UniProtKB/Swiss-Prot annotation:
Name of the protein this chain belongs to: Glutamate N-acetyltransferase
Segments forming a coiled coil: none
Gene Ontology molecular-function annotations: glutamate N-acetyltransferase activity; L-glutamate N-acetyltransferase activity
Pathway the protein takes part in: Amino-acid biosynthesis; L-arginine biosynthesis; L-ornithine and N-acetyl-L-glutamate from L-glutamate and N(2)-acetyl-L-ornithine (cyclic): step 1/1
GO terms of biological process kind: L-arginine biosynthetic process; ornithine biosynthetic process
Source lineage: Archaea, Methanobacteriati, Methanobacteriota, Stenosarchaea group, Methanomicrobia
Compartment(s): Cytoplasm
Site annotation Cleavage: residues: 179-180
Organism: Methanosarcina acetivorans (strain ATCC 35395 / DSM 2834 / JCM 12185 / C2A)
Length: 395
């Protein structure tokens, strides 16, 4: 497997484009084939999520996606669902597609009626620029950004020649479950919808569902995975393993980009729990660590306050014994051990510890010393800017 340029447009059979005008944006991706999706588990579910989930569950295929930024079309009642349907109809009419094979996604402010007339007005401009160049993938990724500071796209080519590419957005209201983000992934492998669905659920659970920026789960999250089947390559059993691994690699890359791009963030936190009795124990603890406002604040302040880490693990619901815990902080290939088998370690190199805490990417490793299961999660520090951004979001 190798990383390649081009984002989703590196995949045969995918054309895309997007425009961004102020806070409003439109993305269109044209690619036809079997498809799978996972969606937010927030019980306050946005209209486009309801529509797109219905498309996936009934058709198991997609012909296109239309997405807008600037308005979530959430908590908008029947009018909101009609607006989502109108978005699908506008695209299907323009491209001569069946409307029940078009997925719709929205991101932005909750509780405000979507201006569909604005979308209809600017849709022709988007469609005129549909293409398969790397620039088209970038334009599509840019148009769905809200408070994101960085574009999020990635593509790989497997040894068998199959390609997978994805774009995503997300920087705030992020604790996927599924959620808080949008991701559109494509492959040219000759695979049916059930294979896509199985690979997607495994990959999402290990990656996007392990990201915490602020602990809030959005109303609009979705990940859609479509195969154009254009490579003509049907992966063998061995290649299917590589296919799943490649999807996990792609989503891990995007998940880390989301965490690093968290609203106001200055540092990426990677937390690892090892030596747990069960995977669920490791998962509970590691997500509690990256979710903890006290841990996140300490990382922002370059404060090696490791007590907050063990406290978060302790209240997470995971089974652990404090006399078995070992804890270290790492960055740039260097590590400082802070706790060993329940005993506080004497840190002789304070300069190294300070150097680690000043790094932009910090790894926290907590070993339970009880088993062989492990889990990894990603988050970011909690800064003054996070409060400012969200205090001023609608005002």
């Amino acid at each position: 497997m190798k990383k390649i340029e081009g984002g989703i447009c590196a995949v045969k059979g995918v054309t895309a484009n997007g425009i961004k005008l102020g806070k409003m944006g439109i993305t269109v991706i044209r690619a036809e084939g079997p498809a799978a999706g996972v969606f937010t588990k927030n019980k306050v579910t946005a209209a486009p999520v309801v529509l797109s989930k219905g498309v996936i569950e009934t058709q198991h295929q997609l012909s296109a996606i239309i997405a807008n930024s600037g308005n979530a079309n959430a908590f908008t009642g029947d009018d909101g669902f009609l607006d989502a349907m109108e978005m699908a109809s506008a695209l299907s009419e323009s491209l001569d597609l069946e409307p029940d094979t078009v997925a719709v996604a929205s991101t932005g402010v909750i509780g405000r009626r979507l201006d569909v007339s604005w979308i209809r007005e600017h849709l022709p401009e988007v469609l005129e620029g549909l293409g398969s160049s790397p620039e088209c993938s970038l334009a599509a990724a840019k148009a769905i950004m809200t408070t994101d500071k960085a574009l999020k796209e990635v593509a790989v080519e497997l040894d068998c020649g199959v390609r997978i590419g994805a774009i995503a957005k997300g920087s705030g209201m992020i604790e996927p479950n599924m959620g808080t983000m949008l991701c559109f992934a494509y492959t040219d492998a000759l695979v049916p919808a059930d294979v896509l669905d199985a690979a997607l659920r495994i990959a999402v659970d290990k990656t996007f569902n392990m990201v915490v920026v602020d602990g809030d789960t959005s109303t609009n999250d979705m990940v859609l995975f479509t195969s154009t089947c254009k490579s003509g390559i049907k992966p063998c059993m061995e290649c299917l393993d590589e296919f799943e691994d490649a999807l996990i690699y792609l989503f891990t890359d995007l998940a880390k980009k989301m965490a690093r791009d968290g609203e106001g963030a200055t540092k990426l936190i990677e937390a690892r729990v090892t030596g747990a009795k069960t995977y669920e124990d490791a998962r509970l603890a590691v997500k509690a660590i990256v979710r903890s406002p006290l841990v996140k604040s300490a990382i922002f302040g370059k404060d090696p306050n490791w007590g907050r880490v063990v406290a978060a693990a302790g209240y997470s619901g995971a089974e652990l014994e404090q006399e078995r815990l070992s804890l270290s902080f790492s960055a740039g290939g260097e590590t400082v051990e802070l706790v060993k088998s329940g005993e506080i370690s004497r840190v002789s190199d304070l300069a190294l510890l300070n150097k680690i805490m000043a790094n932009e990417e910090i790894i926290i490793t907590l070993d339970f010393g009880m088993g062989k299961e492990s889990a990894t999660a990603w988050g970011c520090d909690l800064t003054y800017d996070y409060v400012r951004i969200n205090a001023e979001y609608t005002t």
